[in-house]
């Protein structure tokens, strides 16, 4: 499907020169003089190479047809990540480049959305929040409950984040999967 370059957004998949690219950033620039342009940074799905393209906002770009489906995460091995469609029980192998920064948040039997172009996985969407355990942080100091400063902590998945002073080792917390930021103490 052909669309104008100014309508391309982050997360879209573009087909260019027979290859698929996922859009990382898309910015429309309107200079004081001259023609408005769309600056698009994208990553080639096949090998992970990042490129930056500049189009006139009225240029036509081929947007790939993408289908989102629910999948369950099974396991990770040297070949990549393995997911199963819960309805058809078909298994799909997803390369590490496609999973990217989402890898630490994947847990066995976690439900995720996979974006597919034909039978090729091009993107993964995790649940917005994940519950993890704090495995290392500075000890709780009495009298720091009123302060709004955060302290560094290591989570059970190996990700570093900042937590409030009252959070100690062994506490289960909820974090945003997009950036690993602290949301709240888990209610379980």
Curated annotation (Swiss-Prot):
Pfam families: EFP, EFP_N, Elong-fact-P_C
One Gene Ontology CC term in the entry: cytoplasm
Pathways involved: Protein biosynthesis; polypeptide chain elongation
UniProt cross-references to PROSITE patterns, sorted A to Z: EFP
Gene3D superfamilies per the UniProt record, alphabetical: 2.30.30.30, Nucleic acid-binding proteins (2.40.50.140)
Function in brief: Involved in peptide bond synthesis. Stimulates efficient translation and peptide-bond synthesis on native or reconstituted 70S ribosomes in vitro. Probably functions indirectly by altering the affinity of the ribosome for aminoacyl-tRNA, thus increasing their reactivity as acceptors for peptidyl transferase.
UniProt family annotation: Belongs to the elongation factor P family.
Protein name, entry field: Elongation factor P
Source organism: Rhodopseudomonas palustris (strain BisA53)
Phylogenetic placement of the source organism: Bacteria, Pseudomonadati, Pseudomonadota, Alphaproteobacteria, Hyphomicrobiales
Name of the encoding gene: efp
């Amino acid at each position: 499907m052909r669309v104008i370059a100014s309508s391309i957004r982050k997360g879209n998949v573009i087909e260019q020169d027979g290859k698929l690219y996922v859009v990382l950033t898309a910015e429309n620039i309107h200079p004081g003089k001259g023609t408005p342009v769309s600056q698009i940074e994208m990553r080639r799905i096949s090998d992970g190479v990042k490129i930056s393209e500049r189009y006139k906002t009225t240029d036509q770009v081929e947007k790939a047809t993408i289908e989102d489906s629910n999948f369950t995460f099974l396991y990770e091995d040297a070949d990549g990540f393995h997911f199963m469609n819960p309805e058809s029980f078909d298994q799909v192998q997803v390369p590490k480049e496609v999973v990217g920064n989402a890898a630490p948040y994947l847990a066995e039997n976690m439900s995720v959305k996979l974006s597919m172009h034909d039978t090729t996985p091009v993107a993964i969407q995790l649940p917005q929040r994940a519950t993890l355990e704090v495995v290392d942080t500075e000890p709780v100091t009495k009298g720091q409950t009123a302060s709004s400063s955060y302290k560094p902590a290591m989570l059970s998945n190996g990700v570093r984040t900042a937590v409030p002073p009252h959070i100690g080792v062994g506490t289960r917390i909820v974090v945003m999967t997009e950036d690993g930021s602290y949301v709240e103490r888990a209610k379980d």
